[in-house]
Design a protein with these regions (language model features):
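Conserved mixed alpha/beta catalytic, RNA-binding, or beta-rich assembly cores of soluble enzyme
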Residues: 8-84, 88-97, 102-126, 131-132
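A positional/architectural concept
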Residues: 1-2
Length: 133
């Protein structure tokens, strides 16, 4: 077992994949003590296009890299996590589909909204009490 495997041993985590535009979007969640780390990615070129950070007090910051639009999804997830008091948290998103249409973008946003609902329910079921910092 390498050091990374050892470090993650015992950390609650789960993942979810749902289809969008002929591919799957993946979400991976790590429940840290305290904190939540979420990665949302896939499409034709999974990457990191935006990162949202919620500090322990609930202050929110979103950084979207130039040329990317992933901040919309990051902000939406971060706003919901903040409302649920799931902080501190880091949410990173990188979804890219070559030649995506406006309808395809709407499908990706809709699917990530559905995924958000599942993730919030899963986190709430694992946490005894959200961080009240």
């Amino acid at each position: 077992m390498n050091g990374r495997d050892e470090a993650l041993r015992g950390v609650p985590r789960f993942s979810l994949c749902l289809p969008a535009c002929g591919r799957e979007i993946a979400v991976e969640v790590l429940l840290l003590k305290p904190g939540v780390h979420v990665s949302i990615y896939d499409g034709d070129a999974p990457h990191i296009g935006a990162v949202a950070i919620i500090d322990p007090a609930g202050s929110l910051m979103v950084n979207e890299f130039p040329g990317h639009r992933d901040g919309v999804i990051c902000r939406h997830w971060a706003d919901r996590f903040n409302a649920e008091r799931f902080h501190p948290a880091v949410i990173e998103c990188g979804i890219h589909y070559d030649g995506i249409t406006r309808e395809g973008i709407q499908e990706v946003v809709s699917v990530t909204d559905d995924m958000l609902e599942v993730v919030v329910q899963r986190i709430a079921s694992v946490l005894i009490e959200p961080n009240q910092s």
